[in-house]
Each structure stands twice: as C-alpha cells, then as structure tokens.
UniProtKB/Swiss-Prot annotation:
Iron keyword on record: no
Start and stop residues of the WD repeats: 165-204, 210-249
Any coiled-coil regions, as ranges: none
Region annotation Disordered: where it falls in the sequence: 278-301, 316-345, 389-440
Keywords attached to this entry: Repeat, WD repeat
Protein name: WD40 repeat-containing protein DDB_G0271002
Composition skew (Acidic residues), residue ranges: 325-345, 411-428
PANTHER family: PROTEIN HAIRLESS, RAB-GAP/TBC-RELATED
Domain of life from the UniProt record: Eukaryota
Length: 667
C-alpha cells in the first residue's frame, strides 16, 4: 500500500515537472499548439454527407508586439466587459474607470488628456464600445443604472448624447455603421433600440423582448437591417430590425457571451466597393488629423442628433423610481403588442420558479458566476460540469473523453484497492462496500441527469425548428455568417443557424485548469479583410487566440459524382464551397504573467492601392495596467496558393489580394 502511494507521488511529481516545463515554454513565447497541453479542437454538429476535404489557402499572419507599457494611473474594475477602446486614428485610448471615461495619449498612456464625467449618479460603467454610427466615429458607454452615453470621438467639446434604459443594469452595445441606430441589451432580458434621426428618440425607442435571461452582447449587421444577440439563457437569436421580428433562434448548452457578424461575401463588386470606401475614409481621416485639436481628428459630420437633456433624464429617473414595476408577463405582453413583435415563441415564456432570477443582478459577479441555475449542471469528479458535449453527434469532445476515461480508471483502481483492503480488514470491507454503493448511485444520478438534459435540449431544438421554419430567409439580403462564443467554445454559423462549426476549448492553455463559467470568452472581434476572428478569455486562461476562416471548393469535389447523378440536391451541394475555421496562433502574454483582460480594441490600417499591405493594430489592456499593442499583418504575399479565376488575382506576386473568402471568388 505504501509502495503504491510512493509510486503515485512520484508520478504526480513528474506530472508537475512536466506542467512546469510546459508553463515555462509557454511564457517564453512558444505559442505553437504542440506546446499546449489543452488545445482547441473543432467539431461539426451537422452531417457532411459528401465527406468533403478542405485545406487552408490563406497566407499565415505575422504578429509583432510593438508596444508594452504599464499604466500606473489607471483604476479599472474587474468582471465587467470591455472597458478600453482606441480611436481609429490610433491617437487616443479611452478607459472606463468606475463612473468616468478618461482619454489618454496613446504614446504616453499615463497622461490623461480629458475626463468625461458621465453624470450617472455614480453608477459604474459596464462596457464601452467604439464604432461608426451612420458614418461618424462615436464611443458609447452603458452602466449599472441604465444610463447610455454617446461621445463624439472627432469633437470632444460636442455635447454628449444622453439616453436612458429605465434604471436597468445594461451591458451589450451595438452601433449601426449605416444608419443612426443605437441598441443596448440589459438584465431586463430585453434589447432597446433608438433611432437618433427621430425628433425624440427616447419616446420612439422600441424593444425586442424575447430573451429570458441577461443579454451580454448584441451586434448590428453591416447593412443595419439585422441584429444578432446572445444571452445567458443559452440562446442566440437573429432579428429583423425593420420588422421587429425574430428570424432565427439556436439553443446551445452553455451560457452565451459574445457575438459578431462577419460577411464572407462572394460578390467581388461589393468587396471592391467596401475596400475603396474604407480606404478613402481612412485617407480623409489622416488628412484632417491635425485640423482639430479637440478630438480624434477625423471627419466631423454635422448631424442634428439629440438625446435627453439633463432635466429630462432626471425626470425619467424619478418617474422610474416612483412607478411600481408591473409583473414580468404583463410587461412583456404590453411591449410585444406595442412593438408588433412576432409573438410566436410561447415556449420562451418565463417560468414561475425562475422569478427569483429576474432581479437586476450583475452578469459578472465572481461569487455566483460559476454555477448555473438550470438543471444542466451535474457533478463529475467532484466538479460542477456543464454537459455541453451532448450537442455533438460525434460523441464527447476529447477533453471530456479524457475526463471520462480518468474517472473509469479511477473507479477500477479504487475497486482493486478495496478488494485488497477486504482481505486485510473486515471492517474496512464494509466501508468499501458502502463506498461502492454510493459510487454506483452517483453514477446512476449522473446518467439520469445527462439523459434528462439531452431530452430537454432535443425538445428545445424541435420547438426552435418549428419557429425557424415559419420565417423564410433570403440569403442574398443577409450577411453570410455570424461568430459567437460561450464561456468555453467558439462558433461559426451560417445565417440560418443550422450549420454550426464549433471550436471546443477555444482558448488553449499550457497549464491544466478546470474551465468553469468564469472562464468566459467575453471578447470577440472580427476582421473580414484578413479572414480573422479574435477571441479572448476573461477567465483563468486570459489569453488571445487568432482564428482564420477559409471558404473553398472541396478538393475531392468530383468524388461520388456517379452515385449522386440521380440526386439534384446532392449535385448542387457538391459544387458549394465549404466554410471552415481553424486556430492559427495564440498571442504571447505580457512579461510577468498575464492579468485579467479588461479591454480589447482593433484598429484597421488600409494602404491606398495596396490591399495586400492591409494590417491591424490589436490593443489589449490588463487589469494590472499593462497595455500592449500587437501589429498583425500577412506574413508574406509570395508563394501563396492561388485561385486564378478571381479578378483579385495578382499575376505578379501570384496570389489573391484579399484573405476574405478569396477562394470562392469566380466560382
């Protein structure tokens, strides 16, 4: 018995040394997947009938750390969402610190240029987001009290626009690039949309009230006609903003945290126009960079947008405090009738036993964020586990298979030890029999819980399919794809939400950690020009992964043609490009070990008449004040697999100009 314990201790020490070695390799900046103990794996939850095989044709990216500095004057709160943004001309850093927003010089971030006092009754800011609002660069903030603020980046002296979300803790922000629309999502389980072109946008706002839990992230499509939202209720929804109608819904097995549209268009004229518009806009911004000392130096657009006055906002706050809230069900029915939102989703009505969870509590309370209130949490190896793996037709993900095998091996070993103890001590034998009985009961409970959860999810999917089938979609009018995340996984989906590409354990790590609800992928950005998806974890992993999207004709496109000649649908499917996503690299953390990520911002760099030279600056801020600037670009433009049918094919360098869905061009 003692010898066995010694062997086990030696084995444990060896494992610790191995982990430490990998930990050292990791922090030495060796970010290749071979150094990762837990690495990302992709799963498809749909059946690929043609067994298509694809390969990457994208130029690898090159990442360089241009700047790494510690900001000593910063005071950012933990467990919020994104609290940092960088202006598009890379001149200013915006940091949300408690209830104020500080503007810092990017060359010396310790210098505060201006402070915006939000005048929000000291309500702490939950998130800020920078974007283009109907052609103008703005910064939007939301906070615990439902106060919404819009700052004009190109004119700091311009009056800040005030909007009010009725005292509800607000988290998600969506900025429409092509229309004057601002949307926010909150702990009221509703999405609020304002049209700033209206004379009184606060009165004409409308709601999308279908979610049944807090909504951390929303995003407008580039055209502004559609919106995607994700929620702690484990649902991702796609909305028609103009009709105020739910178009699609998909239910997952984990809390959802972030979402973005990514339009992998196959229309080259649209791509060319998009590039030219972006390039011209950047040129104009640069030409005006020295003309305005009070802001970001871009184009100042004179729009008659208005929000609330301070007096009007104060009156709304007082009225909101005086009026007793109506019951949740009556409130939703009234809002749905006023807003003419499609009410064909009775399966999402609130349950009485969930009423206690409808208070305006924070998303990100570290103390209560690790345990879900639903029945999908079971105990496995003494750890609460969310059984996400049942959504995959291919069985358990590898990590869960490994855990399951470890549990089985442990049970076998325990049974062998119990048999030995049986021969040595009769009293211990009785105890061991009790342990075996308890283990058997626990195993049965786990199996029953899994079956119960699987039945519930299957029933949910049936209802989702029923709802989805009632609203036909015109794919030509919709962006092609959405990217979204849960606390552990990353997803790429078509707009119909029936083809999910899942990256399990999407943030690799070189040291073993039990990934919990706290390890959430809360930061998500997309760069279509590089076919790039940037995902960052706010939890224990605290790392940033770079994913690439490729869409191309299968290599074995002609296989099984004879078998499918009598099936027109199969013939058509054989000619369709297939979309895939893969992990390309993981960015090195700052020296001294990573801290909690509190902000992530992307700035695009266009080069006139040379789209191959397109690059981005990825800015990352940690709670310990470390601020990093990564420069990411194509590693080379030569020796690249080519697709000569594309009008963007460059015969000199023998490569395609864009990484955006390049291999589907000309098909």
């Amino acid at each position: 018995m003692n010898e066995t314990n010694v062997n086990n201790n030696n084995q444990s020490n060896e494992e610790v040394e191995e982990i430490n070695d990998e930990f050292k390799l990791y922090y030495d900046g060796l970010q290749e997947s071979k150094h990762m103990k837990y690495y990302t794996n992709s799963f498809k939850s749909y059946e690929n009938k043609q067994h298509k095989r694809v390969s990457s044709t994208l130029v690898p990216l090159k990442s360089e750390d241009l700047q790494s500095i510690r900001i000593n004057t910063i005071h950012i709160l933990a467990w919020k969402l994104n609290l940092m943004a960088v202006s598009y001309n890379s001149k200013f850093i915006f940091t949300a610190e408690s209830d104020v927003i500080n503007v810092r010089n990017i060359d010396n971030p310790n210098i505060i240029i201006k402070t915006f006092a939000m005048d929000t009754m000291e309500m702490t800011i939950n998130q800020i987001r920078l974007g283009i609002l109907d052609g103008e660069e703005v910064l939007v903030s939301v906070d615990e009290g439902g106060f919404v603020r819009i700052i004009f980046v190109n004119d700091f002296e311009r009056e800040v626009i005030r909007l009010y979300n009725h005292g509800v803790s607000t988290w998600g922000i969506a900025i429409c690039p092509s229309k004057p629309l601002i949307a926010v999502s909150s702990n009221s389980h509703k999405i609020t949309i304002w049209n700033l072109d209206d004379e009184n946008p606060q009165e004409t706002k409308f709601l999308l009230p279908k979610h049944k839990h807090n909504i951390p992230s929303i995003d407008f499509s580039p055209c502004g006609n559609y919106l995607v939202s994700v929620s702690i209720d484990k649902n991702i929804r796609i909305w028609d903003v103009n009709k105020r109608q739910l178009l699609r819904i998909q239910t997952l097995a984990q809390w959802c945290w972030a979402c973005r549209w990514i339009d992998l268009t196959t229309k080259e004229d649209q791509l060319y126009q998009y590039y030219n518009n972006s390039s011209n806009s950047r040129d104009n911004n640069n030409n005006n960079s020295n003309s305005n000392n009070n802001g970001g130096g871009g184009i100042i657009i004179d729009k008659s947008w208005r929000g609330l006055t301070q007096h009007e906002e104060q009156q709304l706050v007082e009225n909101n405090q005086e009026v007793e809230p109506m019951p949740e069900e009556e409130e939703e029915e009234e809002e749905e009738e006023v807003n003419q939102v499609d009410n064909d989703d009775e399966i999402f009505q609130e349950n009485d036993d969930n009423e206690e969870n409808e208070e305006n509590t924070e998303f990100l309370n570290e103390a209560n964020d690790g345990v879900d209130d639903d029945d999908d949490l079971i105990i496995q190896n003494g750890v609460f586990t969310n059984e996400d793996d049942i959504i995959f037709d291919g069985g358990l993900p590898p990590i869960n298979q490994h855990q399951q095998q470890q549990q089985q091996n442990q049970e076998i070993e325990e049974e062998g030890q119990e048999g030995q103890e049986e021969q040595e001590d009769g009293t211990e034998n009785e105890n061991n029999q009790g342990t075996i009985a308890t283990t058997t009961t626990t195993t049965t409970t786990i199996i029953n819980s899994i079956k119960k959860l699987e039945d519930a999810i299957n029933q949910q999917r049936i209802e989702n399919n029923r709802i989805n089938s009632k609203v036909p979609l015109d794919k030509n009018k919709l962006p092609s794809n959405v990217v979204f995340s849960t606390y552990q996984n990353l997803y790429l989906s078509d707009v119909e939400m029936d083809l999910l590409l899942t990256m399990n354990n999407a943030i690799p790590t070189s040291f073993p950690i039990i990934q919990t609800q706290i390890d959430r992928i809360a930061f998500l950005e997309v760069v279509p020009e590089l076919s790039l998806v940037i995902a960052a974890s706010q939890g224990p992993a605290r790392l940033i992964s770079l994913y690439r999207i490729v869409k191309q004709i299968p290599l074995n496109n002609n296989i099984n043609n004879n078998e499918n000649n009598n099936n027109e649908n199969n013939d058509n499917n054989l000619n369709e490009p297939e979309t895939n996503m893969f992990l390309e690299s993981v960015l090195s953390p700052p020296s001294g070990g990573p801290g909690l990520i509190v902000g992530l911002s992307v700035v695009k760099n266009y080069v006139k008449n040379n789209p191959l030279a397109f690059s981005i600056n990825l800015y990352v801020m940690y709670i310990n004040g470390i601020f990093i600037n990564f420069h990411i670009k194509r590693s080379t433009i030569r020796n690249k697999p080519i697709h000569q049918n594309s009008t963007f094919f460059d015969p000199i360098n023998k490569c395609n100009i864009f990484g955006l869905d390049i291999t589907s061009f000309g098909v």
